C-alpha cells in the first residue's frame, strides 16, 4: 500500500531561465502562467527543455532545480528501499520512537493487501499484542519493557508518512530503476511520476536501447 498526497511542483520558471544562461538566450523565453497559477512552457522553452533532457545528465542540470514536494504514506519495507536515494532528496517522517504509543494499533496501520488468510491472522494477533503493550505503556510511562516490545516487534509492513522533497533528476533515476520492480508500491509511484507536469517530455527521456 502506498498513498501519495499534497504534490507540489516548484521553480519551473527559474530552472528554465537558468537553462538559458549558457547562451544568454533569455529573450527567447516564451513561457507564462495560466489563470490558475500553473507554469506553462512555451514552444521555445519546451523545445529547449526536451533537447537538454535527452542530451544526458551533464546537460540537463536545470532538472535538478525543478523541485517536487509530496506526502507519501508507505510501509517501512518500502521506505528502506527509497532511502537508497540520498542525493538531492530530503524527507521528514512521523516518528515511531516518539509517537508509537499515541494511537491505538489497528490492522489499517499496516500494508496487508497481499496477505492471505493465514498472514492476516498472524498480523491480527501481532496487532492485538502491540495494542496491549501500548496500553501498558500509556498507563505507566516508566514501563520501558512495554515500549521496547512495541519497537522491536513493529513489523516492516507498518505504514509511515513522510514529507519528501525531490527534483526532476531524482525522478528520472527512480523511474527507470523501479518501474519494473516486484513491489507494487513502486509501480504506483512511477504512475505518479508519469502524471507530473511535463514528465513525459523531460523525465521519461531514456530510449529502450538505454534501459
What residues fall within each predicted segment?
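Family-specific signature for flavin-dependent thymidylate synthase
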Residues: 1-211
Amino acid at each position: 500500500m502506498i498513498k501519495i498526497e499534497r504534490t507540489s511542483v516548484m521553480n519551473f520558471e527559474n530552472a528554465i531561465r537558468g537553462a538559458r544562461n549558457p547562451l544568454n538566450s533569455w529573450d527567447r523565453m516564451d513561457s507564462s502562467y495560466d489563470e490558475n497559477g500553473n507554469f506553462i512552457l512555451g514552444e521555445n522553452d519546451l523545445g529547449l527543455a526536451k533537447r537538454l533532457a535527452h542530451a544526458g545528465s551533464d546537460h540537463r542540470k536545470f532538472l535538478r532545480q525543478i523541485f517536487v514536494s509530496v506526502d507519501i504514506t508507505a510501509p517501512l519495507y518500502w521506505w528502506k528501499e527509497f532511502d537508497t536515494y540520498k542525493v538531492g532528496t530530503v524527507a521528514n517522517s512521523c516518528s515511531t520512537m516518539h509517537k508509537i504509543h499515541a494511537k491505538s494499533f489497528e490492522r489499517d496501520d499496516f500494508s496487508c493487501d497481499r496477505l492471505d488468510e493465514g498472514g492476516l491472522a498472524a498480523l491480527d494477533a501481532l496487532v492485538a499484542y502491540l495494542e496491549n503493550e501500548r496500553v501498558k505503556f500509556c498507563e505507566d510511562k516508566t514501563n520501558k519493557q512495554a515500549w521496547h516490545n512495541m519497537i522491536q516487534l513493529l513489523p516492516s509492513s507498518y505504514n509511515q508518512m513522510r514529507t519528501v522533497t525531490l527534483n526532476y533528476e531524482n525522478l528520472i533515476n527512480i523511474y527507470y530503476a523501479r518501474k519494473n520492480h516486484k513491489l507494487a508500491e513502486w509501480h504506483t509511484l512511477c504512475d505518479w511520476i508519469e502524471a507530473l507536469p511535463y514528465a513525459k517530455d523531460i523525465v521519461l527521456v531514456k530510449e529502450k536501447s538505454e534501459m
